[in-house]
Amino acid sequence: MISVVGGVYEERCKYPAWNQIYGSGLRAAIAVSSVSDTVSLHAYVPEEWTKDVELTLASFGVNGDLHASKHPMSFEYLHSFVRVDPPEQQPSLYPALSVESDVVLRFGMMESDARVKGDRVVYDPQAPDASYYCNGSNAGSLAMIVSGWELPGTRAELLKRRSEDRQESLMPNEDTLLKAIINLRDLPHPPQIVLVKDGLGGLIVFQGDQPVSVPSYAAESFFRIGAGDVTAAAFAHAWGELNLDPVDAAHYAARCTAYFVEGPRLPLPSVAGVSDRKPNTIRRERIRIVGLGDFELDALAHTTQGWLSYLGGDVSYVKFGLEGLASNGQDDIDLLLVGSRCSMKEFEAAARADLQPTVIFWPSAEAFAAQFYFPDAVVASDYATALYHVMRSSKQ
């Protein structure tokens, strides 16, 4: 049995098109409904969504402890790396939810808090410097799962980087990360396990003296919205309910994340159902980008350089257009960005230039044609999927 405490929110994304009611709480409860005997969701739900949410929970066999709220909240995305507008802040918080269960997965929420008690608890604060115990929550064993910059003490370093106009990064550097873990362990009630998400489906597990890296696992596509929720849910099931070792549970969570992002697909398979997933090797080679198309591709090419650097990639050069590529001896391209209005004539010119792109991003209905000209390339019409494949090692 597992109890999930978390938000239910609307999610809207332009690329890829997505308009659904999920949020961390609802997504996680659905995720584990196939592998857990009993799942309960404890959440605030806007009155106009209550009937739909109840029907959704019933279809997956999830028990709902739903509390009415009056303010629907929506997360807006341009694409899955860019959240356009955060939800409006609530005028006041609703009363804290109170949950007690053997196994609890607790998410941070926008509209309220949750006071929980459990034998094994997984806490995903979804905010920097959050404390599990400050509201009276208790746990026999506590696992905390966070993004790197959510660790206590990292906020100051992040603000410093921004003030110096340095390149944004998904993860703190190793020194900052280790200092944050040490500071966390010095708290009066530290978590026994800390898992840091790497943004591509992998994890770093801190338990004992040595951190253990758990790789991301291979996926054909990469639907990023909600991937962290699925990671937390899968780990909570494997560690909390199945009593797996934390590292083994983290491997299961990473495999489940790869399963989810290929769809998105819910609910999740069992441990045996994802055992054949192959691990990724994160790219260490330098990345080469070429943009092909209209003026906006020049801007997209440089923006993409920033995103790949954010994900930990090392971009060696960015080129707009085909001129001079052969003379520079740089025909092997890691990412070819093709404009949505790029003509087949321009694309055929790229093929005649004998480029050998590893990944092609082409947000066009004609994207399938790219496979004819570049049969060995991964062709993606989704931006996050293209970046994901670029970040996988070319030597795999």
Residue ranges and their predicted role:
Residues 65-68, 375-386:
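Short acidic-hydrophobic, aromatic-tinged amphipathic segments that line or gate anion-handling sites
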Residues 150, 154, 283-319, 323-326:
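Redox- and metal-dependent alpha/beta enzyme cores, enriched for Fe-S-associated oxidoreductases
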Residues 100-108, 119-122, 324-349:
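Short, well-ordered secondary-structure micro-motifs within conserved domains or adaptor modules
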Residues 21, 26, 218-281:
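Conserved post-catalytic alpha-helical subdomain immediately downstream of the catalytic base
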Residues 2-5, 9-19, 31-120, 277-287:
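Conserved N-terminal subdomain of the carbohydrate kinase-like
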Residues 1-43, 48-52, 215, 221, ...:
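Glycine-rich phosphate/adenosyl-contacting loop at the front of the ribokinase-like
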Residues 82-103, 108, 127-131, 308-331, ...:
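A short, well-structured beta->alpha microelement
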Residues 119-211:
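Conserved phosphate/ATP/ADP-binding segment of small-molecule kinases
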